[in-house]
Swiss-Prot record:
Record-linked PROSITE patterns: ABC_TRANSPORTER_1, ABC_TRANSPORTER_2, METN
Annotated residues for binding of ATP: 38-45
Reactions accelerated catalytically: L-methionine(out) + ATP + H2O = L-methionine(in) + ADP + phosphate + H(+); D-methionine(out) + ATP + H2O = D-methionine(in) + ADP + phosphate + H(+)
Quaternary organization: The complex is composed of two ATP-binding proteins (MetN), two transmembrane proteins (MetI) and a solute-binding protein (MetQ).
A Pfam short name: ABC_tran
Protein name: Methionine import ATP-binding protein MetN
SMART domains: AAA (SM00382), NIL (SM00930)
Gene: metN
GO molecular function: ABC-type D-methionine transporter activity; ATP binding; ATP hydrolysis activity
Source organism: Escherichia coli O6:H1 (strain CFT073 / ATCC 700928 / UPEC)
Keyword terms of this UniProt record: Amino-acid transport, ATP-binding, Cell inner membrane, Cell membrane, Membrane, Nucleotide-binding, Translocase, Transport
Protein task: Part of the ABC transporter complex MetNIQ involved in methionine import. Responsible for energy coupling to the transport system.
EC number(s) recorded for this UniProt protein: 7.4.2.11
Annotated family: Belongs to the ABC transporter superfamily. Methionine importer (TC 3.A.1.24) family.
Length: 343
């Protein structure tokens, strides 16, 4: 549905040249929810704006539903953009128009008959859960409701693609979850292809099928969400994953934790489990095999891309030889082990 090939984007600011994107290629199959994650300034907003040519690439090809957008005339591009809806971090609603009027605007600009506008807007407001807000004004809506209006407006022309530019970053966690569930529901009901950009791995984990990691204008890793979570190939991907699978060391342990071993100390471990290792009784097995005892301090389990993930903080009690053997055995069984220090 979306195919970006060798996209490069260069900005000129006076005598300065800024390369925002460098030879980026990305394929989003029809019906998928695809996430692009990166830090601020990585190039993700420029990338998503190249899809509908709000930013025209310096080099490269942009195919949407089999149509090459970079070669179209302005009138042809305007027509093609009707198949590409877009929502933003800021909702950009017209304060002088009601909810109905905001959603109706793109249909009015397209000279859609009034009866069809009424039918379509009513249908969309019901879809986004705002069937009772036809006559409300944006000033009377919550942030989540405003974003729902923006989503309905983006769907007014019945697009095949929806672009989401940090669409939840201005919302609180509970509202973010509700908007993500709405996007997932729309994807499922309408078969809509969704490309979203974010700096939050929680967003990717919750709804995306695939994810690409962008850094300094380049895609450094891309795969299914489950594969990236299970086997991250780059330090940046690992960092994003750790930000969503995170356990804080309790304060009393932080006060006692030391970087180097000392007499009668035990190692504190951070264990990450993925796939089959999540449900396997691996800690019990280490106790039997290596004569070690594990004192679990805290643990958390979650899902990403349909795959279960777990994280645990534990003290491993035993001789140095036994604990080293137990750690090596856990690593052989696909558990990521990090020695945080000694207590």
């Amino acid at each position: 549905m979306i195919k970006l090939s060798n996209i490069t984007k260069v900005f000129h600011q006076g005598t300065r040249t800024i390369q925002a994107l460098n030879n980026v290629s990305l394929h989003v199959p029809a019906g998928q929810i695809y996430g692009v994650i990166g830090a601020s300034g990585a190039g993700k907003s420029t990338l998503i704006r190249c899809v509908n040519l709000l930013e025209r690439p310096t080099e490269g090809s942009v195919l949407v539903d089999g149509q090459e957008l970079t070669t179209l005339s302005e009138s042809e591009l305007t027509k093609a953009r009707r198949q590409i809806g877009m929502i933003f971090q800021h909702f950009n609603l017209l304060s002088s128009r009601t909810v109905f009027g905001n959603v109706a605007l793109p249909l009015e600009l397209d000279n859609t008959p009034k009866d069809e506008i009424k039918r379509r807007v009513t249908e969309l407001l019901s879809l986004v859960g705002l069937g009772d807000k036809h006559d409300s004004y944006p000033s009377n809506l919550s942030g989540g409701q405003k974003q729902r209006v923006a989503i309905a407006r983006a769907l007014a022309s019945n697009p095949k693609v929806l672009l989401c530019d940090e669409a939840t970053s201005a919302l609180d966690p509970a509202t973010t979850r509700s908007i993500l569930e709405l996007l997932k529901d729309i994807n499922r009901r309408l078969g809509l292809t969704i490309l979203l950009i974010t700096h939050e791995m929680d967003v990717v984990k919750r709804i995306c099928d695939c994810v690409a990691v962008i850094s300094n204008g380049e895609l450094i890793e891309q795969d299914t969400v489950s594969e990236v979570f299970s086997h991250p190939k780059t330090p940046l991907a690992q960092k994003f994953i750790q930000s969503t699978l995170h356990l804080d060391i309790p304060e009393d342990y932080q006060e006692r934790l030391q970087a180097e071993p000392f007499t009668d100390c035990v190692p504190m471990l951070r264990l990450e489990f993925t796939g089959q290792s999540v449900d396997a009784p691996l800690l019990s097995e280490t106790a039997r095999r290596f004569n070690v005892n594990n004192n679990i301090i805290s643990a958390q389990m979650d899902y990403a891309g349909g795959v279960k993930f777990g994280i645990m903080l534990t003290e491993m009690h035993g001789t140095q030889q036994d604990t080293q053997a137990a750690i090596a055995w856990l690593q052989e069984h696909h558990v990521k082990v990090e020695v945080l220090g000694y207590v």
